[in-house]
Amino acid sequence: HVSALAMYNQTMKYYPDSNPDEFKSIPRSYIGLVGRATYDWKTRYMVEMNVGYNGSENFAPGKRFGLFPAVSAGWVLTEENFMQPLKPWLSYFKLRASYGVVGNDRVSGNYRFLYLPDSYNPSTGSYYFGNSISTAWQGAVESKIGNPDVTWETAAKQNYGVDAYFINSKLKVNFDYFIERRKDILTNRKVLPTYLAANLPIANIGKVDNKGYELSVNWRDRIHD
């Protein structure tokens, strides 16, 4: 059995803030293409491939689009002839593996349009010029520094698993081992000289590796009718 899907997606959120009665921000928009193909042979061999090509307004032209593929495969060994003698003691046994890349364009603090040039806001303080100290002038402060090179944060995820059912599926055991490598994390540098008096721009500078395993055991039986 073979199936395929292709989809174009374009969304625009008109109320990015929590209060829908106020237009505190301009609309937030995304655009992308999604594709999927699956293959299943007698519920024995299964393969699925997915791909996403997404665009975000947070990045500069040339940096806005990211390609995020994923693939997974499964093998049900209990559908093989050589495994039949083990039934019903081993009711179901499946090996599976998957690999995929996902992207993120959001930043803590809900910053937007990270690539735009520096912006300035009126200063809350006053400044004096010349010999007179009786006249104060309002100034401006640099509120945000843009970064035209900022782009998608990505996370590559691997998963390897085993599903085993015993004794007519009364005992079910599921095991997963996962590895995640996240890179180009969107964040800003926290260390800078105090005399710089500026907010450093958002950049792709973070990196986190994570791995672990999950094990679940479930027993389900009927005591009597």
PLM feature segments, named:
Residues 1-225:
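Extracellular/periplasmic, surface-exposed regions of secreted and cell-surface proteins
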